């Protein structure tokens, strides 16, 4: 009897920790899953980037701890090693280059008749340095060169090709894609309220051209890169803009950017009415639709964005929302869907 009593107590002593251990393991798994969910649905923001901003005239990139002064003409000529050409546009040719073991993008003016556009883009880069714009490393007006941080993932045009790679499958979700759309709208909002006044992204007459103006960073953020065509709208003085001097076609551009006098009247630039920053708002739904792609859940996001996108496509510019209005709507949808999915997931545990 004594032996049996001892055995019975021994079994109880061994079994109790097993049960407690199982409960503890399940609790830890739930905590880990909650943390993963919170990380997956992390709200978009660039506080880290903000804390790393340098004063005007200085830059920092990659693993640099301290800010350095923009490189001078002499430093660009002697310290930058040109590697290979990676792009070319109407104004400049771009080369992957190296500076002190940092990969950088060296832009060279290719046509002297485009120097005014080149210098305009440089002035915009210098004045609009922020988390929304590619980092300026140096420049030389005399040589027609601009040096910026290099982003190996390239322009937004490459987004689908990039996200289809197996190593990026974890970020190929509607959550991350919606965050990209929010960052795109944030850039438009920044340009419309920039330190240089209301600026319009004019190099955007079709979707491929628009996407080519932005770069995808290695941490899957978006920065504006090509600022050669950012005319100023001044509502107080009644100054409006026109994107170029040629007739525009298609439904990607806003209705007010189209020739209003019919096919029987030949296009004349001096007769073409001017317009304001609401042309950027018209294009947001098309760019966002591209960014959302066709992954699981992206159509659900489109459904929730239907009303704000419908407002963006108003034929009357004044009735379109502001970029801030659009951004607010995107954030509401993001948080609403995040809370819904997290709630459903936690209920399944």
Swiss-Prot record:
UniProt-annotated glycosylation sites, renumbered to this chain: 66, 164, 219
Location in the cell: Endoplasmic reticulum membrane
Record domain Protein kinase: where: 80-349
Pfam families reported in the protein's UniProt record: PK_Tyr_Ser-Thr
Top-level enzyme category: transferase
Topology feature Cytoplasmic, residues: 1-19
Gene Ontology CC: one annotated term: endoplasmic reticulum membrane
Transmembrane segments: 20-42
Source organism superkingdom: Eukaryota
InterPro entries in the cross-refs: Kinase-like_dom_sf, POMK, Prot_kinase_dom, Ser-Thr/Tyr_kinase_cat_dom
Intervals, Lumenal compartment: 43-349
EC number: 2.7.1.183
Record field: catalytic activity: 3-O-[beta-D-GalNAc-(1->3)-beta-D-GlcNAc-(1->4)-alpha-D-Man]-L-Thr-[protein] + ATP = 3-O-[beta-D-GalNAc-(1->3)-beta-D-GlcNAc-(1->4)-(O-6-P-alpha-D-Man)]-Thr-[protein] + ADP + H(+)
Membrane association type: Single-pass type II membrane protein
UniProt keyword list: ATP-binding, Endoplasmic reticulum, Glycoprotein, Kinase, Membrane, Nucleotide-binding, Signal-anchor, Transferase, Transmembrane, Transmembrane helix
Alphabetical GO biological process terms: brain development; carbohydrate phosphorylation; learning or memory; neuromuscular process; protein O-linked glycosylation; sensory perception of pain
PROSITE patterns assigned: PROTEIN_KINASE_DOM
UniProt keyword Transcription regulation, yes or no: no
Family membership noted in the UniProt record: Belongs to the protein kinase superfamily. Ser/Thr protein kinase family. STKL subfamily.
Name assigned to this protein: Protein O-mannose kinase
